[in-house]
Design a protein with these regions (language model features):
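Rossmann-like NAD(P)-binding element
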Residues: 1-7, 22
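Glycine/Thr-rich phosphate-binding loops of Rossmann-like dinucleotide-binding domains
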Residues: 7-8, 87
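Rossmann-fold NAD(P)-binding glycine/threonine-rich loop
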Residues: 9-16, 24-47, 58
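Short gly/pro/ser/thr-enriched loop/turn and capping motifs at secondary-structure boundaries
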Residues: 28-33, 51-56, 80, 84-86
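Flexible, glycine/proline-enriched loop segments at strand-loop-helix junctions
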Residues: 46-51, 140-143
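Oxidoreductase and adenylate-handling cofactor-binding alpha/beta cores
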Residues: 57-73
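C-terminal catalytic/substrate-binding lobe primarily of soluble NAD(P)-dependent oxidoreductases
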Residues: 69-178
């Protein structure tokens, strides 16, 4: 696996060489711009196939589809994901097991702006304030964790079929007090 900053170079080479692509990373706008070329070449470029993003999308869609199938409707959507560590494996000061690029774990609070909607109010949280606005999330059987907002939750509104839902937030869990 390559770091995300290298993906566009690899993607362009794969498009030129007619090779399929799979990554665990978010889809940048530059990659969306290649969608027509990828389809015209008969290629499959699959992204967001890690834990988060990835497995979180699949579990969210499974739940949303079941609710819709049973005649329900969503009034709010909040989803948190994280590599929760088994207590017997908690052997480092961070209380965290690196399941992805360690550099990205360290710089997770840097970058652009986290975007989400809460009770009908759009929220924009600069990354330098990300870890100052955590929420406590209880996971039965595992305890309390800190949750913080993930990047741009709003771009998943269409993908999840959530239209004008008043609350849409995707977040990350970390050990309390991380």
């Amino acid at each position: 696996m390559l770091p995300a900053f290298m993906h566009m170079d690899v993607v362009k080479d794969c498009l030129r060489l007619k090779k399929h692509v799979i990554t665990p990373s978010y889809v940048p706008d530059a990659l969306w711009a290649l969608d027509g070329e990828v389809k015209a070449a008969g290629l499959i470029f699959l992204n967001e196939l890690g834990l988060d993003p990835g497995i979180d999308h699949m579990s969210a869609m499974r739940i949303l589809d079941r609710i819709r199938r049973e005649g329900g409707r969503m009034e709010a959507f909040e989803s948190y994901c994280g590599g929760l560590i088994a207590p017997e494996s908690d052997t480092n000061p961070w209380g965290y097991k690196f399941t992805w690029n360690p550099r990205n774990v360290v710089i997770a609070g840097q970058g652009g702006m986290a975007r989400y909607i809460k009770d009908g109010e759009y929220k924009y949280l600069p990354y330098h304030r990300l870890f100052q606005q955590t929420v406590r999330v209880s996971v039965p059987g595992f305890g309390e964790f800190d949750g913080y907002v993930n990047r741009d939750s709003l771009k998943y509104r269409k993908h999840y079929g959530l239209g004008e839902i008043p609350t849409l937030l995707r977040g990350t869990l970390r050990k309390a007090g991380f």
